[in-house]
Regions:
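Central I-helix of cytochrome P450 enzymes
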Residues: 222-232
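Short hydrophobic signal-anchor/transmembrane segments that target glycosyltransferases
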Residues: 213-223
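A structural signal for isolated positions on well-ordered beta-strands in alpha/beta enzyme cores
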Residues: 2-4, 30-31, 113, 141, ...
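Active-site and donor-binding regions of nucleotide-sugar-utilizing enzymes
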Residues: 4-7, 13-19, 46, 58-157
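N-terminal subdomain of nucleotide-sugar transferases
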Residues: 1-36
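N-terminal beta-loop-helix "entrance" segment that forms/cooperates
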Residues: 37-53
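A nucleotide-sugar donor-handling region in carbohydrate enzymes
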Residues: 37-41, 60, 138-213
Length: 232
């Protein structure tokens, strides 16, 4: 089967590290990088260090409003689908790249496979919520991280087939966890001891653009640190 996979941001590169290597054992995959995350630290480093296959097609689309960016991606992905003629288009998560890939495929009458389908924040002010809901309703095969996500899709009467396959990030952790534990270089450079720190990333606008919300997250991390470690 010929599969066109559309990725564009950091979390999607990480997930593709687990999925693409298995997909390519039995199918023909073409990887498209929209360019939503495009610098070395948010893009190239993952292809190098996680052995993600290099994208066969790079669209170089970044910046602009969510609407403008999605429209540019949609326009660029359309001819790619026509050229590759895939049997399915695979998308991850809830980004502008996700929606553009799903919509372009649906308009070309190509089945959409959505990894991490059925997740909901129930906050329609979030661009990601709109992206994930719309993509789910465009998809033929919805791969869910949990039974709760399957039930959510059933409650929305989606037309595609929803299947609970587990959390792809668990696969990533099992695949790359031993390698990360063996590499103590980053800890030495940061001056921290193994097991004596918490690492968290925050990037969603709803979490980082609101100072009060960001403070809540920091306070929660401090609470978890104190509760989980002997800090006396």
């Amino acid at each position: 089967m010929r599969v066109l996979t559309v990725v564009g941001n950091r979390p999607q590169f990480v997930k593709a590290a687990a999925v693409s290597r298995l997909l390519r054992e039995r199918h023909e995959e073409t990887l498209v990088h929209t360019g939503q995350h495009h610098d070395d630290e948010l893009s190239d480093v993952f292809f190098r260090e996680l052995s993600v296959p290099r994208p066969e097609i790079e669209l170089g689309i970044s910046g602009g409003s969510n609407t403008a960016q999605t429209a540019r991606m949609l326009s660029a992905i359309e001819p790619v689908i026509a050229e590759v003629a895939p049997d399915a288009v695979l998308v991850y998560g809830d980004t502008n790249s996700t929606l553009a890939g799903g919509l372009a495929a649906a308009q070309a009458q190509v089945p959409v496979v959505h990894v991490e389908a059925g997740m909901r924040s129930f906050d329609r002010t979030m661009p990601e919520e709109l992206n994930r809901v719309l993509t789910d309703h465009l998809s033929a095969l919805l791969l869910c991280s949990s039974q709760a996500a399957v039930r959510q899709l059933e409650s929305e009467h989606v037309h595609g087939r929803a299947v609970a396959v587990g959390d792809v990030m668990t696969d990533v952790a099992m695949l790359f966890g031993p390698r990360c534990k063996a590499d103590q270089g980053p800890l030495a450079e940061a001056g921290v001891m193994a097991g004596a720190y918490l690492l968290a990333t925050a990037h969603r606008a709803g979490n980082v653009d609101d100072p009060a919300r960001l403070r809540q997250l920091v306070d929660l991390l401090i609470f978890l640190f104190v509760a989980g470690y002997d800090t006396s």
